[in-house]
Amino acid sequence: MAVSKITLHYAQTTGGSNEAAAAFPWNTPKKAVNPYLDPAEFAPESALSNLIALYAVDNEQEQLRRETLSDEVWERYFFNESRDPVQREMEQDRLINHAKTAREQQRFNPDLVIIANVGAQPAHISKPLLERIKYFHSLGRAKAYSRYLQKTIRPCLERLERVRDSQVSASFRFMASHDGLEGLLVLPEMNQDQVKRLSTLVAAHMSMCLDAACGDLFVSDDVKPEEIRQAWERVAAEAMRLEVIPPAFEQLRRKKRRRKPVPYELIPPSLARMLCADWWYRKLWQMRCEWREEQLRAVCLVNKKASPYVSYEAVIHKREQRRKSLEFFRSHELINEDGDTLDMEDVVNASNSNPAHRRNEMMACVKGLELIAEMRGDCAVFYTITCPSRFHATLNNGRPNPKWTSATVRQSSDYLVDTFAAFRKAMHKAGLRWYGVRVAEPHHDGTVHWHLLCFMRKKDRRSITALLRKFAIREDREELGANTGPRFKPELINPRKGTPTSYIAKYISKNIDGRGLAKEISKETGRSLRDSAEHVSAWASLHRVQQFRFFGIPGRQAYRELRLLAGQAARVQGERKAGAPVLDNPRLDAVLAAADAGCFATYIMKQGGVLVPRKHHLVRTAYELNDEPSAYGDHGIRIYGIWSPIAEGKICTHAVKWKKVRKAVDVQEAAADQGACAPWTRTRTRGNNCPPVENLNKSGGDLPDIKTMNEKELQDYLHNMGQKERRELTARLRLVKPKRKTVYKQNISEQQRLQLEAELTARGFEGSASEIDLLLRGGSIPSGAGLRIFYRNHRLQEDDKWRQ
């Protein structure tokens, strides 16, 4: 108690002295001089000391980097198992023990063998399979997990080996044995850069083969054409070892009964292609994609449970290819000799390459067939033909098909083509005729099947149906039994249910762009037909399957050329009397008028009608050789116009020659895109650094001001303008930026705005006010893979055709 009182008294005394010191600053105690405790107050930092400290830090970091690099070099080149016998022996013992342990585990658990085999596969096979195995393992059902490995994964691996053996033949392996061509054995695992390098090596090998053949065959200076053909045969034989058909092979190969002389002029272009690395790249890349897709089909990664019709990898590649094509079209334009320009994107969208135009033309053609059938009193039958079970890789439940014989998608298409050719030959021999259209589309595993809309005489319907059934089920007949429906299904079209056009409309739209099928659900895949259209398009492009084919009617290319001619005549003649003839021959003018009106039924009847041989058609497509040779020295064939056997000469519909050029770049936008280095870049170029406007003013400064002219003076000036002045005027007009159209803005409620913000957030976007305002004004946001997000009809949609 006494100690606490003394302590309290001492604290009060000390506190009072401190308060007095705080009141008078001269009474504060002085700090002891000790440079070791606080040297900063007595040694202020200078610029030199800071620089020395920075150098010291840099030296320490450099020393640490050198020590780390020295340790890495020591570990890699001096202290490793290849140079240290003791460490090498220890590493070998560790690997042997690990292998023994794994072998013991696999003997007691066969599932581990399957997982190990899956892990040994390439990444495009092992990664998706391991994800599925991991998912089944996470379910916690041991028996189902083991059954999945034994009944699904193991058969898939066995099928994969059979597919690889069928892809790589003995001759292909022989070619891969040459120096530098070992990559042919792993072609499906390569990317584009690797395939490009491999194609260069293959082209070099073909060049060496040609040099060796020339050295053996060309013994004298007077080389005969037959000796050149023998040298070509040697190079062609090497190309055929790679499962590639040489160019012009059918025309140049040896035949026992040749009716025409050998076209020796085709040998140089054929050799130029077989010695070109770009040509080999296209062939090898196509082969790589097909082989890779067939391997994915073998392991059940192409079906309605995984990816219908085609693999996701092929769909993504098709999207990227479409995106690059759109960028190319938007960056180029077409120009003629007069300086007139056309936007290349507008030209492509206005052509038959536009899916909407292609669909409309096909629907118009089918409608014309329907009208002709009504006029003739013919009946319409809808047929469905499917390949045998040995062509189907996957069952309907997504499991491997035990009857599959490693047949490819292309082989299934060839089977249907051969079957149809045999049936058509037998039908003509029996005196039966029909006309219509067929549509080729895939099953969920990619196997081809056909839908045919055929028109025929009512008295021939039973005979044609029975004959077609005979050819459709003649192979593997025992697997069908009494029910032939899975292979062949006929359906007589009932006018009460719908017209023939309505029957085929869904299949046409489904295989082009899925227009109008957003609410239609596929019975086979369970997905929307509009969403499946992208997969179907990628499937047809990858496997080179012709989706649509009309038969028994005149060609549609002449129809397109006639419509083009009618449009050109209307522009040239100006205001002419409605119905005035364009062609002198009234029969040809009637065909032209029918095509211009868009009536396929009238066009077909004016051409001669259905079931008429091609040699009796009035109007046909005319072709000619290109003026300029290709990169391989040959002149390709292009469309010239139309011609008719009842009239002399040809009519040209492509008189103006257009050249593809890159669009002019806006200098201000290009400089803004270059950033801070733009001024240096402009001043360091060797060419003229003036903007295009200044260059144009220097070269064409004597051009009059068009703005000050009235309408009559402007017409006279444009009429008397020379070619050089016209080009300069076109260049000036090209620099004028078009005025932006006033965009609209959609009005939505607050609830719809909140819903739009939530949907954007769910898709991975910020959902900010700027993004919502952009969508409401008709804009779009890129979402990856060439697709864009846009807001239309109070719905958030994703498409790559949002501009149309």
Swiss-Prot record:
Root EC class: hydrolase
Domain of life of the organism encoding this protein: Bacteria
InterPro entries to which the protein is assigned, alphabetical: Replication_gene_A-like
Keyword Hydrolase part of the UniProt annotation: yes
Record: active site: Y503 (o-(5'-phospho-dna)-tyrosine intermediate), Y507 (o-(5'-phospho-dna)-tyrosine intermediate)
GO biological process, one term: DNA replication
Enzyme Commission number(s) from the entry: 3.1.-.-
Disulfide bonds: none
GO terms, molecular function: endonuclease activity
Key words, A-Z: DNA replication, Endonuclease, Hydrolase, Nuclease
Pfam families, per database record: Phage_GPA (PF05840)
Role according to the record: Possible endonuclease which induces a single-strand cut and initiates DNA replication.
Stated family: Belongs to the phage GPA family.
Name of the protein this chain belongs to: Probable replication endonuclease from prophage-like region 2
